[in-house]
Amino acid sequence: MLRIFPIAAPTSFTSDFNEGRSGGRLHAGNDLFAERGAPLVAVDDGQVRSGRDPLGGNILNLYANDGTRYYYAHLDAFADGTATLIDPPAPRMARAGEIVGFLGNTGNAKTTVPHVHFEIHPGNGPAIDPVPALQSAPRMSDPRVMLAGTASQRNVLVTVSAVTLLSLGAWALLYPNDAQALIRRLGV
């Protein structure tokens, strides 16, 4: 179901779908934990719409071409580097593996450790348990992902040193503009 795992960094998670939350609500997704600022990537090709929500803080919705909506919440910043939105930007297209934001703890998560709340809504309907899809999703370090680009991108992968692959991740080779944005954000 997911073409790529939503975080391009070491991540931990457990199944917390449908667990009780404050105000009598149920947890409609899963919390994925990683370092603050870890790159969040599009799990499929589709349209990205970012915004702000009292519970989710900085949020984005990815509307995949098959009608599935993927919801990401508590972002530290969006891919364009903005941390807050006064006027939501126009929707934009993203490819699977492209950076769409950075992990944080905004909204009602400001007193928690950094994480992304992630939901899957097939047909833009009710949320389903994302754990099975997350467990089977390829990670950025997976050879299937690293070889998924065009012939010229695959040639670059073959010639790049292992150190570069480990330090920047395979997505940096497939999405060099995103890699440069991350480098600017990290100040390296």
Where are these regions (language model features)?
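Zn2+-dependent peptidoglycan hydrolase active-site motif and core
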Residues: 42-89, 109-119
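Short hydrophobic alpha-helical membrane-entry/anchor segments
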Residues: 155-159, 167-186
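A generic structural motif
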Residues: 17, 36, 52, 76-79, ...
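Residue-level detector of conserved, well-ordered beta-strand and adjacent loop positions
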Residues: 14, 33, 63, 73-76, ...
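Acidic, glycine-rich catalytic/binding loops that coordinate metals and/or anionic ligands
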Residues: 1-12, 33, 68, 81-98, ...
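A structural signal for short beta-strand/turn segments enriched in small hydrophobics and glycine
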Residues: 13, 40-42, 46-48, 89-106
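Short, solvent-exposed coil/turn segments
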Residues: 6-7, 25-27, 35, 55, ...
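Short glycine/threonine/proline-enriched tight-turn/helix- or strand-capping micro-motif at secondary-structure
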Residues: 11-45, 72-73
